Amino acid sequence: HVKSIESWLATAGELPLQVKLLIEGEEEVGSEHLEAFLKDNAEQLACDCVVISDTSQFAPGVPAITYGLRGIAYFELKLLGPKQDLHSGVFGGGVANPANAMAKMFGALVDADGRVTIPGFYDDVADLTERERAEFAALPFDEEGFKSQLGVEHLAGEKGFSTIERRWARPTLDINGLTSGYQGAGAKTVLPAKATAKLSCRLVPNQDPHKVAAGLKKRLEEFLPPGIRMKLVEHHGAPGIVMPLDSPYLQAAAVAVEKGFERRPVFIREGGSIPIVNKFASVLNADVLLLGWGQNDDNPHSPNEKFSLDDYHRGIRASAALWQELAAIKKNG
């Protein structure tokens, strides 16, 4: 975007509309101070549309505009039993085992059909429209290639939905990490004093992270045996978001991306979460465009992270066209 602005200034002397740049470096640590900054500077940052580039193309040569993201609710669970690890031969059968209790809890959180069993979990879920399901089905998605890329033989998830629908637009619950007892080499037959785990729910529009947290606590307590204490800590959370497909800003972006990439973009949703999107939309009362130029195999956060120079140049052209297309909306509106 910066390069496209430089190009406009170098060739035309000015931009066709007012552009405000916000460079924020806390995204990887939760953007803790962003919301307060937006509120404190709302008048200076007032705008009709926010452009964020933190997404990707759908596939090589298939540019995409992301119009929806899942939200997230993230938790840490601790189950506490005896004051110290015990000998399972001496005490096993007489003292509740936190690891056993956690295994039973987790086994009950998702049923055989892949549905989350938290009370009220699906009450507020915004269902996909028939248009969305048809457009997702028409995308050039190679399921066998997807499995090969991941190194798995079978895919899993909620019954009644395609792989893309499950990844982009259905809520989930996943265990992100767990530990208990002895993890070293050889055998050590302990009855562990505690078990800890990290878990998260990916949410879709209309689901409230705090309501999900309350439901999760209630569900876990159903399987809490006597002699075990439970601590459930609710960490960061954010609701899902979806932008209307008929938004004039979305349609203007489609024209601009086509000019930059010489191919009409597809409209997609993504399964990840970008909490700042909700903050921009709510605090500034603005539409949000998610335009990403990278590829799914760019290995973000990895030591060998990359970005194609061809995509870089196409992105500059698309961004330059975007300012013109957005200016036309303002002029005609």
Named regions from a protein language model:
Residues 202-205, 231-246:
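A short beta-alpha structural unit
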Residues 104, 185-215:
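C-terminal catalytic subdomain
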Residues 128-136, 240-249, 278-283:
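Short glycine/threonine-rich loop-to-helix capping motif typified by GTGT followed
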